[in-house]
Amino acid sequence: MAKINDNYLKLKAGYLFPEIGRRVREFTAANPSAKVIRLGIGDVTRPLAPTVLKAFHAAVDDLATTDQFAGYGPEQGYDWLINAIIEKSYKPLGVDLKTEEMFISDGSKCDCANILDIFALDNVVAIGDPVYPVYNDTNVMIGRTGEADEKGYYQNIVYLPCNEANNFIPSLPTQKVDIIYLCFPNNPTGTVASKAELKKWIDYANANDAIIFFDAAYEAFITNPEIPHSIYEIEGAKKCAIEFRSFSKTAGFTGVRCGLVVVPEEVMGTTASGEKYSFNKLWLRRTTTKFNGASYPVQRAAAAVYSEEGWKQTKEIIDYYMENARIIREGLKEVGVTCYGGVDAPYIWLKTPGGMSSWDFFDKLLNECNVVGTPGSGFGPSGEGFFRLSAFGHRENVIEAVERIKKNLK
């Protein structure tokens, strides 16, 4: 009989969001007339920008003609999309990238998991706590960890607490690690890191021959001009950092699927025999073997985001969500709730009132306010006592949800 990958059995029962879905389904089945407002999972609600949608339609129409038909595209992505991203998104930051250093994908969630294919299993990994669950769980799935302890910490992973004391920015590890996950603007806490704070991590990585996985999925939501949008804005990052970006929240592509990975040619690892080797070459080899490229219509739509009109419309949608974030943040503060984030990120990280557990507060909001959020403990043990609300809802629902919560907590 074929053997399974036993590493999957190490995972705690139920990925966070399916568990939320299960509880919501149970509630709605028992309360069919209740209007449940979902501010939990970070799915977008606004339509695609008109210019983006027009490009999407035009690309589909291309497939109906012999002259314009597009079959298999380049696995790394079309140059016209890669160059548009470099010119419009990176060069204004003072970051110069080569076309060969960027890879278009079908989403950064997959990329954050798939990048592990090119790293040896005996690398020591450091992740924040709380953290986007994909970082933790994919390392378990691939076989890098031992079992989880009673807190949920897995053997062979170094956890870096992110709490009020350190402003939810992890401190440098006290031991040598090989791979470091950083996410700014952060999911779930909504916090951001300054250039000086990122420089500490870059210096650590270069001094210890470590690699930083920098998740910049929410960089488009930054409002403070002093906060870096890319880790490559900081000197030395091209030698030690791989950056992930996503169109999911930036352009509303959660149902369209498109992302990108930047792997600079300078980022090197070592072979088992101690020789240096390019991670860019390994990722290209992995990509051409396991991926046939994001679809042509999707890449045409993504390129339209960077047109003058496309970006103007996309920015209006981003501003809409950030106004939602302001409404949530300010509304909760009115009733004395301690909140973080929601200024340079679309997530509000709130401290649960009265010392309630994260899941107890989830049940309270669901049952008493008919509002769904995300328990902080689902992102890791250090998230206990906190709760995440998303700004990606419809404005009228956000306003109503905040009013319900305020009334309940007064």
Swiss-Prot record:
PANTHER family noted in UniProt: AMINOTRANSFERASE
Quaternary state and interactors: Homodimer.
Record EC number: 2.6.1.83
Post-translational modification N6-(pyridoxal phosphate)lysine, affected residues: K249
Domain of life: Bacteria
Species per Swiss-Prot/TrEMBL record: Trichlorobacter lovleyi (strain ATCC BAA-1151 / DSM 17278 / SZ)
Record-given protein name: LL-diaminopimelate aminotransferase
Swiss-Prot/TrEMBL cofactor(s): pyridoxal 5'-phosphate
Associated pathway: Amino-acid biosynthesis; L-lysine biosynthesis via DAP pathway; LL-2,6-diaminopimelate from (S)-tetrahydrodipicolinate (aminotransferase route): step 1/1
Gene: dapL
Protein family membership: Belongs to the class-I pyridoxal-phosphate-dependent aminotransferase family. LL-diaminopimelate aminotransferase subfamily.
Keyword annotations: Aminotransferase, Pyridoxal phosphate, Transferase
Binding site for pyridoxal 5'-phosphate: Y72, S108, K109, Y132, N187, Y218, S246, F247, S248, R257, N292
Claim: Transferase is one of the keywords in the record: yes
The keyword Transferase is assigned to this record: yes
CDD domains: AAT_like
